Amino acid sequence: MLLGSLGVAAIGVLSACGGNDSPSTSASSSSGKNSSAAGAAGSILVWTDSNREPVLRKVAEQFKSDTGVTVKLAVKDFAKIPDDFITQAPTGKGPDAAIAAHDATGRMVQNGVIAPLELGEISAYQDVAIQAFTVNGKIYGVPYATENIALVRNTTFVKDAPKTFDDMIEMGKKSGAKYPFLVGLDPKQSDPYHLYPFQASFGAPVFELKDKGFDSSKVAMGGTNGEKFASWLADQGKTKNFNLNVSQDISKDLFAKGQAAFILTGPWSLDSFTKAGIKYEISEVPSAGDRPATPFVGVQGFWMSAKTKDAVATQKFLVEYIGNPNVQTELFKVGHRPPASKQAFEKAKTDKDVAAFGAVGQKAVPMPNIPAMGSVWADWGVAQAEIISGKASSPKATWDAMVKAIDEKIKKG
């Protein structure tokens, strides 16, 4: 049994401490006793992706046994969940809960389709995971995993981690590798997510930084520091350190073929490197400016619908079962993303790769979760691509125009 000793009594104690385009459904088949804590026996619907479905199916069986409530699972395309949720929740046909990436949370709150959750002892979770699902002081998700990028180096070419971006390029050139450094980009949209650590190292964060994350009402990537980054970005395009024609898939493939000394990527790429027999090490992203290169961290979790007809059972399933360290450990095994639960993370970090990415993630900041981020990413990426490609006659002017456009969109809400 997945949860082993996780009976009703154990659940009470522990609670204190991204598929297919067309949905398919499965329901837990175990029968068991009812629990007044979960309300009258009935059913709830949870949207998940295909990767997490096998784990959730076992958790659903345990929940059915403990409470009498059936958890129906619908497998969905992870990327389509936010839009489908917004469309279906108001009609009463949406789920009671859904797997989610935190950065869409603000939009979901704005549309009134998700409800805040009472997590109990929030100190049981990584601080950054709680911050990620927090909107206007309320927590709107049960986090289960975090992910961030880091620098991966082929130790056949380079033994030691670089301290600065320039050091990295120099080490890569001297290594004998065909490509000193790779980062996957898009010809029209660049990739602000992957390039953000370098931007942050110039003192140009996307928004003003506060103790608990960003103040998303104040765009902070403009001014002198932003212009310095824009000029640096143009230089990287000229020297081909950044190549818009090298996508994420291409960069990963080249590194897996042993043709690159360094690559900027996340844990999602490691399986292909391991299968290819590449010997690698993971380290912090080297700074290009005079400040630390701070990456974004993405957090995955589960939302509860504001339209659920059984908030008690849904909250119980999410907080006490999905939030359980044993369950988060099982979810880690299928995704290899560091668990959001501190207890589960301690167990997972015996894997050196998890420990390395987790160490970088401790210094990362959550991707902003405001509703306007869709427009922010678009404007940001287009400006970067124009600068890197050399199409921007004035990198500084292009950057300043982008910042102004984003600022106006943020103010409009």
Whereabouts are the PLM-identified features?
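Extracytoplasmic/periplasmic substrate-recognition and gating elements
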Residues: 139, 274-334, 393, 411-412
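Short helix-initiation/N-cap motifs at beta->coil->alpha
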Residues: 76-84, 103, 167, 243-256
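Glycine-centered hinge/linker elements that transmit conformational signals in sensory
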Residues: 214-244
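Hinge/lid segment of periplasmic solute-binding proteins
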Residues: 102-149, 160, 165-169, 177, ...
